[in-house]
Amino acid sequence: MVTATKLEYINRVIDDCLSEDGDALELNGKFIGDEGVEALVSTNRNFDVENLDLSKNKLTWRGAHHLFHSQQFKNLKRLYLGDNNISDKGVKALPNANFLENLSLLDLRYNNIGEDGGMAVVQCEKLRKLQILIFQENPIGDKPVIALATAKAFANLRKLNLYRTDLSVKGVKILAKSKVLQRVKNLNLARNYLNLDSAQYLAKTKTLVNIETLLMFDTQIGD
């Protein structure tokens, strides 16, 4: 239940963190928690926010559900949810969000998201304008990456961060053949279970030819 006290508090936080032009709501590190997000979406305020940063706010799946079922951020273009604990249960509600069709950046790093949650994201067909996808430090494994490689909705991706996501050579092999991800310029595969074969698959790719930055450090690939 959202009390008057909670609404008063969250309105003060919003006033402090909303940019002058109303485009950005920077709540990074405010630790508002699930109840804070519930209060946020329960205000009667109409937001024209394009940039929403909820990183480091002790959010769980409950907070994610409040956000994804809200109707107040329809103009959102960039969403930062890093360093929380929304988990598979939370991210599975993402397809319900009303702002997905305009979203260009989705940062999910450090959220205890596994294979099921990863699949929920890559199977979402509304993310056609997404250019930056950050899965960093979530153990999603190969299956979501393999699905992403053929997911036509993600054809506009420019940056894909798979740092320490339990990715293996199996996923990289399919990724290197992806016709969907031909626009990717920045690919981070560092700290995964990759061997020399992984590097060779990427070196011989005929589709990922626009990559300008490729990170593969701290893997099993030698010098």
Locate predicted features:
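Solenoidal tandem-repeat scaffolds enriched in leucines and small polar residues
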Residues: 104-186, 190-191, 196
